[in-house]
Amino acid sequence: MRPSLDSYAHLAGGKVRDLYTIDDEHLLLVASDRISAYDHVLSTPIPDKGRVLTAMSVFFFGVLGGNNHLAGEPDDSRIPEEVLGRALVVRKLNMVPVECVARGYLTGSGLIDYNETGAVCGVALPEGLVEASQLPDPIFTPARKAELGEHDENISFEAVVEKVGQDLAVKLRDDTLDVYGRASNFAADRGIILADTKLEFGLDAQNNLILADEVLTPDSSRYWPADGYEAGKVQPSFDKQFVRNWLTGPESGWDRASDTPPPPLPAEIVEATRARYIEAYERISGLSFADWVG
């Protein structure tokens, strides 16, 4: 018989995930159907989103191999029935306070930085780049993790060195770019561009660097269809950029610069977003989401 979620102490909650304590060495990481955009948690959930994020993370942890925080199978007996398919048993780690971002294409906050300074996080880039330009080489563009409701702040590699030391900063950069390189090649073989991705790492008791949190999901990554890719325009996507675009478009009536929260999402935006998340999982993994746990 599986335990109930109430039997675990709630440790922390974020925009999308909740952490519960299982024992001294293990946590339960639960992905909700909440969706965030522009540092707001929207009032409208996306059905099955948490299950897609969990399925995608498990798939890519398997593809990447190496050290990661998984400590059980997706149907582990310690996972309560009510969160089966959207929860994982993971190792308790000392999380590194840096968002590790790799970019192979210029878009989002990276494009804003580039247009203002000609660089992203202190990394100088060639002149003449536009929305969705492919970069000469992938770059490491870290960010300082913000509190709920605050903006993540892009920082330089030197700021990471000051925060965690030279050796760990180099390891974070190298591991992030390695994961991005392998994952982008994997996605490209399936007709999908991995424009960028955000990773998080933790340290175990022996100070080994461990890949943690979610990995290469539609929440933490920008996925574009390779068919029809054209620099200079906003790309169609398999991620929450679709929601961002609706929020900042005329139909939502929302002013991002105001203090008001975003409006509820219309049913057609909810369903289209759900479909995009599932399509990303199925196209990249080659698996049917209908066969996923839960």
Swiss-Prot record:
The keyword tRNA processing does not apply. GO terms for biological process: 'de novo' IMP biosynthetic process. InterPro entries: SAICAR_synt/ADE2_N (IPR028923), SAICAR_synth (IPR001636), SAICAR_synthetase_CS (IPR018236). GO terms for cellular component: cytoplasm. NCBIfam families: PRK13961.1 (NF010568), purC (TIGR00081). Belongs to the SAICAR synthetase family. This is Phosphoribosylaminoimidazole-succinocarboxamide synthase. It comes from Rhodococcus opacus (strain B4). The lineage of its organism: Bacteria, Bacillati, Actinomycetota, Actinomycetes, Mycobacteriales. The gene is purC.
